[in-house]
Amino acid sequence: MQIILLEKIGGLGNLGDIVTVKNGYARNFLIPAGKAKRATEANMKEFEARRAELEAKQAEILADARVRQEKLDGQTITVAQKAGVDGRLFGSVTNADIAAAIVAAGIEAVKANVRLPNGPLKAVGEYEVEVALHTDAVAKITVAVVAATE
């Protein structure tokens, strides 16, 4: 199915690009989420009429993400979790736990933004973690996992 992208989508294209994707991806995700429209003549004309407005909106979203990236870059976020004597955690630290710690620090983030390439953190220590606030704004933070005191 051919669609018009209404925002930049990593691995797919930029605002206004006409791309071909699988029908299910378009119907079940991109179109309902407002990220794309079918590439019909009427939709293309409507898009061209609204192009400046959509570009301004995307620029505003990117500027907001860059501000949050500036606040986050280089920060150390501490997460306390119960641990054994050998430093292994009872449970693990997930992206939801890290996102909650970032929000507690006063910066807006959701768990989908936190990228843990090696899966949940299962031991005490410091870990480099990426927080993808936008496709063009990725902050690198240090997550310090410490043993919780009871």
Curated annotation (Swiss-Prot):
Gene Ontology biological-process entries: translation
Pfam family, one: Ribosomal_L9_C
Gene3D superfamilies from the UniProt entry: Ribosomal protein L9, C-terminal domain (3.10.430.100), Ribosomal protein L9, N-terminal domain (3.40.5.10)
Record key words, sorted: Ribonucleoprotein, Ribosomal protein, RNA-binding, rRNA-binding
Signal peptide annotation: none
Any one annotated GO CC term: ribosome
GO MF assignments: rRNA binding; structural constituent of ribosome
Tagged with keyword RNA-binding: yes
Domain of life: Bacteria
InterPro entries to which the protein is assigned, alphabetical: Ribosomal_bL9, Ribosomal_bL9/RNase_H1_N, Ribosomal_bL9_bac/chp, Ribosomal_bL9_C, Ribosomal_bL9_C_sf, Ribosomal_bL9_N, Ribosomal_bL9_N_sf
HAMAP family registered for this protein in UniProt: Ribosomal_bL9 (MF_00503)
NCBIfam families from the UniProt entry: L9
Primary role: Binds to the 23S rRNA.
UniProt similarity note: Belongs to the bacterial ribosomal protein bL9 family.
Name by which UniProt lists this protein: Large ribosomal subunit protein bL9
Lineage, top ranks: Bacteria, Pseudomonadati, Pseudomonadota, Betaproteobacteria, Neisseriales
